[in-house]
Amino acid sequence: MKDQLGFRIVLCSAVFIILTQNRALADLDSESHEVNSESVGEEQWEMVQRKGMQFTLNGQPFYVNGFNTYWMMTLAADNSTRGKVTEVFQQASAVGMTVGRTWAFNDGQWRALQKSPSVYDEEVFKALDFVLSEARKYKIRLILSLVNNWDAYGGKAQYVKWGNASGLNLTSDDDFFTNPTLRNFYQSHVRTVLNRVNTFTNITYKNDPTIFAWELMNEPRCPSDPSGDKLQSWIQEMAVFVKSLDAKHLVEIGLEGFYGPSAPARTRFNPNPYAAQVGTDFIRNNQVLGIDFASVHVYPDSWISPAVSNSFLEFTSSWMQAHVEDAEMYLGMPVLFTEFGVSAHDPGFNTSFRDMMLNTVYKMTLNSTRKGGAGAGSLVWQVFPQGAEFMDDGYAVYLTRAHTASKIISLQSKRLAIFNSLCSWRCRWGCKKKNQTALDALLSHDEL
């Protein structure tokens, strides 16, 4: 009788979650983009924290099914495209996504946030304010990245240009990591962003629970120093610097996850030999004081071969499993797979294969979630609304027309929501309750 009662409790809780999200998904199908204060609720909006190898929110585990949309600040800076930002949040929320990732930088380029060192465009900053305020309305938290490794949106190359314009004689983009002037430029930007008071909510960024985490850099690499020492020194300095300004928020590096010299036995998991030569070192980098969780990206089409094949799925599984194991054995922290996807530009691409990629990533995440492991979630690259095709890099998932992908994403959200709502820290390793069998039965279904 107790087992039956336990099953009923689990079932009723799960059904409530499912019905709530199914109604939201129906709203997505009808392309209704309206929201009001009643639909988003007014309950307390708290910071996500970390406890051991898991994220927590109000004492409960917080597993992530999320998305990337890097361009939100840029489109929010123009009233004619600002509505696309709202559409992204509405559509992501409708399939149960709770965390997004976007840029809190645009250095010296079109619609630049930072036009030159410490000189900002207030209208673009207000656009970032808007992004955060809209995210809060839809109960979505954001990982904000603070600079790019790549030239897009300025990146470390723009900082080097600024340095040379100020009279320095810099010859490599990697001077970004070592030159004191450029380090000061970066720290000034970090200080400005963290101390920004949102013009829509009147909340200082460093006090805003809408921000899930600060990301030091998108995909940092320092190929001029394969030993990894230069990048390690930069990470050590900047992680402590961010924490000195904001001890409340989580901090992560923004790594792709490549293994380096400190763990030669793990380099066999790298996608290619070059990955060990780019100056990053997954385990060593994440052992730095001030880093709260590890990030990993998953791009077999960029790293292995542009031609779609089942080897992509095999690599994805082994790559994710290796990093979950490392997070548990060596780091003692959560690992979040903050970017993954497959491009429509790849030879042999079809939407069915993209759906298989989604299922593979979600299965690996759920395998860790079931046992209370370090695999804390994933964020697909990337969610797009209709009408933003001109920003599409090939990886866009249009939720209103990719119906199978939307259902897969929604199902993952429902499964993780069951854990988030039913688990507590009294059952630390994966909800080991008497009703675990009933819970496993629910999670094994392809439809909820």
Curated annotation (Swiss-Prot):
Subcellular localization, as worded in the UniProt entry: Secreted
Pfam families: Cellulase
Annotated coiled-coil segments of the chain: none
Binding site residues for substrate: W103, N218, Y299, W381
GO molecular function per UniProt: mannan endo-1,4-beta-mannosidase activity
One of the record's GO cellular component terms: extracellular region
EC numbers: 3.2.1.78
Entry-listed glycosylation sites: N79, N164, N169, N202, N350, N367, N435
Species, as recorded: Arabidopsis thaliana
Recorded family membership: Belongs to the glycosyl hydrolase 5 (cellulase A) family.
Reactions catalysed according to its record: Random hydrolysis of (1->4)-beta-D-mannosidic linkages in mannans, galactomannans and glucomannans
Keyword Plastid attributed: no
Active site: E219, E339
Protein name, per record: Mannan endo-1,4-beta-mannosidase 6
Underlying gene: MAN6
Main subcellular localisation: secreted
